[in-house]
A protein has these predicted regions:
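A nucleotide-sugar donor-handling region in carbohydrate enzymes
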Residues: 126-189, 207-210
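Conserved nucleotide-sugar donor-binding subdomain of glycosyltransferases
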Residues: 67-96, 101-104
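Conserved nucleotide-sugar phosphate-binding/catalytic loop shared by glycosyltransferases and other
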Residues: 8-12, 32-79
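Conserved nucleotide-sugar donor-interacting segment of glycosyltransferase catalytic cores
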Residues: 94-139
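Conserved small/polar residues in nucleotide/adenosyl-binding loops
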Residues: 325-331
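Short amphipathic alpha-helix
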Residues: 14-25
Length: 332
């Protein structure tokens, strides 16, 4: 049985989730081709578990200083390239297409009548979950971006809908609370981040991203992207300051870590995540990063957690049943 698995590459959360699902599908004996889009090939890291995989340009949002730039996003669209990439996929060689909000694979399935399954947090927004008011056009675009036949939404709460818990790794290292804070703000201006954190001189911050090598400046240690290094620090840190992405927030909550999230402004998913976190009382949220706001959060020792659920195994079993049913129906 052949599967095309599309991964939206703009956010590391999509990749983290797929690192769990794709090897599990292959262990079941399925042939899985992997397609990533949304960033340049040399900007991916720790990708061994996906090999072999292909990369395409895809569609992505342009972000500057923590805010989505809609006009720049429109200018950067390469619709001709998207159409070329779409036509290059031999969809008929696949029994099913699975996508984690990756548009090329989703539209290839739709164009060629292949059964498609969407697995990801963004598919939970097709249900009645907390969302910011307004953003009517943005919400329509979200629904159009990577359409599927069967959407499987993931969220921190079911909200009375058919929604699954987060697909996250069960981290097995020793969880401690050492005297440093992990910072992951890839969409923010690094100079602003540094100026804010430098003023909190009695705290040590491990800031991931924005550098290709380790740099120590006063109380800030800049670290290059590394999944293994990041997880090690995540397990032992005293708190996490990050954007309002779904996957990292889920990992923090599973480890009972103190967390402050700042959404990428005008990004509907992250604004919705902030609303959900506020409604559920799971994290401290802020619309801007300032020394006073971060200092107040550091003084607050409130921690919230969510239980870990093994979502991967039953989800893989369900996908296997879908494939067997599809195969039996085709043979009749």
């Amino acid at each position: 049985m052949n599967i095309l698995y599309g991964i939206q590459g703009t956010g590391n959360g999509h990749i983290t989730r797929s690192r769990l699902l794709i090897p599990s599908l292959r262990k079941k004996g399925f042939n899985v081709d992997v397609l990533l889009s949304g960033r340049k090939k040399d900007e991916y890291w720790d990708m061994e578990c996906f090999r072999p995989y292909d990369t395409k340009f895809g569609i992505t949002f342009q972000v500057a200083n923590g805010t989505v730039n809609k006009w720049k996003t429109i200018k950067k669209l390469k619709l001709k390239q998207f159409w070329t990439d779409l036509k290059s996929i031999d969809s008929k060689s696949y029994d099913i297409i699975i996508t984690d909000y990756e548009p090329i694979s989703a539209w290839a399935a739709k164009k060629n009548g292949i059964l498609s399954i969407g697995i990801g947090h963004l598919y939970s927004f097709l249900y009645n979950v907390p969302m910011q008011n307004g953003f009517f056009l943005d919400k329509k675009i979200m629904n159009w971006f990577a359409p599927v036949d069967i959407p499987i939404g993931l969220h921190w709460h079911h909200f009375g809908q058919n929604i699954l818990p987060p697909v996250i790794p069960q981290l097995k290292g020793k969880v401690t609370n050492e005297d440093f804070v992990v910072v992951y703000l890839p969409w923010e201006n690094p100079n602003l981040v540094e100026s804010v954190l430098n003023k909190i001189s009695d705290k040590v911050f491990y800031v991931y991203g924005h550098t290709s090598e380790k740099i120590v400046r006063d109380n800030i240690i800049w670290k290059p992207s590394s999944r293994a290094g990041f997880i090690k620090d995540l397990e032992s840190c005293n708190g996490v300051l990050c954007n309002a992405g779904f996957e990292l927030t889920s990992e923090c909550l599973s480890l009972n870590k103190k967390i402050m999230v700042k959404p990428v402004m005008s990004q509907v998913e992250q604004l919705a995540n902030v609303k959900a976190l506020d409604n559920l009382g799971l994290a401290t949220t802020t619309n801007k990063i300032t020394t006073a706001i971060v200092s107040d959060w550091l003084e607050n020792n409130t921690r919230n957690s969510l239980p870990y659920f093994n979502v991967v195994d039953p989800l893989i079993d369900w996908i296997e049943c879908c494939l067997l049913y599809t195969s039996d129906a085709a043979d009749e």
